Amino acid sequence: MFGRRPDGRRIKGIDPIMRITPYVMPMRCDAQVFLKHRADLEVLHDYVRRQRLEKGEQISYMQIIVAAYVRAVSRNPQVNRFIVNKQLFARNNCSCAFTILKDPRDIDKGEAVVKIRFDLADTLYDVRDRMEAAIAANRIDQPPGFAEKLVNGIFALPGLATVAVALVRLLDRYGIAPAVLMDALPFYVGMYITNVASLKVQDVNHHLYNWGNVGMFVGMGLEERSAVVEQGQTRMKRFLPLGVTIDERVCSGAHYARFLKAIRRYLKHPELLELPPDEVCFDQDCEYHEPKPQRAAAAKQKA
């Protein structure tokens, strides 16, 4: 309300075209843009292997992708904005969510959604440590969290779910939804990423949710092999396909292009993510920081 929300502040001085766009495309699903990118899997594989053998560091492909996202946002904060009630807001955090199995050995034990906040000065190792800690916390037996209790509660009475969801939508529309609710739900993050390759599925372009304010969805797919010509010789090259879905209303095409160019650069040269950025750019009146993460227990390979 009055330009402030628990998760952001309304942007002032918007370009007229950007300002009218949410009125032309009022719903997030109206403004979805679907992109495809194939990362060089051989580069990523060699980098992960070197990290393990030379430094004893355990790094995953997903962690590299998330670290690339965080670093690209640190120089292009415009892509981290979101639209609510046809108004443009600067997000006051850099966050990501993804779904994991509570027990990878037993799919019947259900899933858990992991939601993590990052600092824009995070290195690849910081991102890895935050992700490992969050995954470990969600894979141990623990009482139901706030979100699970809330969902179970609203289904206790017939018809209550419809009323409760409508009420939350109304509160969210005017920026007065409780911060504890936004923190618990995975629909209030900058990026949602899914590794469907772990399910033996090809890459997907996942839809954006009209609920909440997720502005980007990334789907990691199964390895692909394609013929390429290098130095006059043809060979089969390995690629990691990524399906990317974005909300075109949050910033200009030029900002998105610069952001995606940075992502491609970091996926081609992941070693650039090992050190903090030289400079961090915050959006309009939205500077934020997160404490340094603790070292993940499983991050270092045992000697």
Segments (PLM) and residue ranges:
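C-terminal catalytic/motor cores of large multi-domain enzyme assemblies
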Residues: 1-303
